From Swiss-Prot:
Heme b binds at residues 63, 91. Residues 2-145 form the Globin domain. PANTHER family: HEMOGLOBIN FAMILY MEMBER, HEMOGLOBIN SUBUNIT BETA-1. CDD domains: Hb-beta-like (cd08925). GO terms for biological process: hydrogen peroxide catabolic process. Keywords: Heme, Iron, Metal-binding, Oxygen transport, Transport. The keyword Methyltransferase does not apply. It comes from the Eukaryota. GO terms for molecular function: haptoglobin binding; heme binding; metal ion binding; organic acid binding; oxygen binding; oxygen carrier activity; peroxidase activity. InterPro entries: Globin, Globin-like_sf, Globin/Proto, Hemoglobin_b, Hemoglobin_oxygen_transport. Belongs to the globin family. This is Hemoglobin subunit beta-2.
Length: 145
């Protein structure tokens, strides 16, 4: 993914303020609530029976934080996302995750970021994040044949 210097500035300005646990937990919870079929990948997470249960599930929050930290690392290396090959292979061969869910998750993260950063999250900032997350989703989806 090629980002302009301005797009990188937009992303860094927001990302430097992100609370991984809060934003990651909210994003994964939102994914599981809005796209309930994604819950099948998290059968070991316990109670996912309602929006409230999902939003307060410690495993959802912890995994959301983990995923967001991984995205944070990817944002530092958008020019070379080949390091995500093993993660891609794991999601493809072991977990059988539909690669469209990576795109969905990126979209959900954008929504949560917009909620948290209101005025700062301009259309230009959103466009930069959409572009970057698209590259990350593509890299993680590369392990699919």
């Amino acid at each position: 993914v090629h980002l302009t210097d301005q797009e990188i500035k937009y992303i860094n300005a927001i990302w430097s303020k992100v609370d991984y646990k809060q934003v990651g937990g909210e994003a994964l919870a939102r994914l599981l609530i809005v796209y309930p079929w994604t819950q099948r990948y998290f059968s070991t997470f316990g109670n996912l029976a309602s929006a409230d249960a999902i939003s307060h599930n410690s495993k959802v929050i912890a995994h959301g934080e983990k995923v967001l930290r991984s995205i944070g690392e990817a944002l530092k290396h958008l020019d070379n996302l080949k390091g995500y090959a093993k993660l891609s292979q794991y999601h493809s061969e072991k977990l059988h995750v539909d690669p469209a869910n990576f795109v969905r998750f990126g979209g959900v993260v954008v929504i949560v970021l917009a909620h948290h950063f209101h005025e700062e999250f301009t259309p230009e900032v959103q466009a930069a994040f959409e572009k970057a997350f698209g590259g990350v989703a593509d890299a993680v989806g590369k392990g699919y044949h």
